[in-house]
Every structure is written in C-alpha cells, then in structure tokens.
From Swiss-Prot:
PANTHER family: UPF0178 PROTEIN YAII
Family: Belongs to the UPF0178 family.
Name listed for the protein in its UniProt record: UPF0178 protein CKO_02784
UniProt cross-references to InterPro entries, sorted A to Z: UPF0178
CDD domains attached to this UniProt entry: PIN_YqxD-like
Length: 152
C-alpha cells in the first residue's frame, strides 16, 4: 500500500502531517508534482516529478495507484477515478470521498464551473484552519486503522 499525494496543490502543513505519518506507519509516501519538491530524508518518502501540463500529475496517480492505496487530493475528478480503481481518497480538509458522495461532488463542481464560465464570481475555499488540519490527521489515522484491520 502507498499514499499518493497530488502535491502541486497540497498545502505544506498537510504535507508535514503526511511526512510524519509515513514514518510512523512505515508506509510509502509518493508526492507527484510538476516541479521539484523538497522532502525530508526518509526511506519511505519520495517525489515523482512529471512534465507540466493539464492533468499530467493526476493521470500519473491514476495510472500507478492500486486498490487499497490512499490518494490525497482536492481534485474531485481525480478522486472519482481513483475510487473506481479501489483506492481511498481524502482531501486536505479531511473529507473522505466515497462512492456515495463523489457523484454529488462532481455535479456541484460542474455547476460551479458553469457559473464561473458565465462570469459569476464564486470565490474560493476558505484557508485551511487548525480544525481542518486536525480533521485531516484524524481521518488519516482512521484510514490507517482500517488498513491494519484488513491486513491482520
């Protein structure tokens, strides 16, 4: 099992949580980005640099992830694709994407895209709060416990 990170858009504070968790869990953590990233020295943490371009990092994550892996992303279409492969998906705010919620999320995303395309200012998400960080760490631990139960 591997934790994959859509790293270009992942907040640094979330990456820090993931670095510590990867060491604690002794789980491979792969950060996929179209730029060089600095990561702490570790036998569990590595980066995968992809060429710049629309959805290049997303496509690489989809290509390489497997059932049972975890993907960290705020990209709803990417989350949908990895769920289809049997991987879990978690956004940086700690919201777990599921088969039952992803359709609604995709519909809302498409609706917001339509509003923006028509010139309506929709605003962006609030900045990551301490509560969001705690929620992310808790959901990451919850996923890890599920993995441990399945592999016993």
């Amino acid at each position: 099992m591997t934790i994959w990170v859509d790293a270009d858009a992942c907040p640094n504070v979330i990456k820090e949580i993931l670095y510590r968790a990867s060491e604690r869990m002794q789980m491979p953590l792969i950060l996929v980005a179209n730029q060089n990233l600095r990561v702490p020295p570790s036998r569990f943490i590595r980066t995968l640099r992809v060429p710049a371009g629309f959805d290049v990092a997303d496509n690489e994550i989809v290509r390489q992830c497997e059932a049972g892996d975890l993907v960290i992303t705020a990209d709803i279409p990417l989350a949908s694709e990895v769920l289809e492969k049997g991987a879990a998906a978690l956004n940086p705010r700690g919201e777990r994407y599921t088969e039952s919620t992803i359709r609604e999320r995709l519909t809302m995303r498409d609706f917001m895209d339509t509003l923006r395309a028509s010139g309506i200012q929709t605003g962006g998400p609030d900045s990551l709060s301490p509560r969001d960080r705690q929620h992310f760490a808790a959901e990451l631990d919850k996923w890890w416990l599920e993995v441990q139960r399945r592999t016993r």
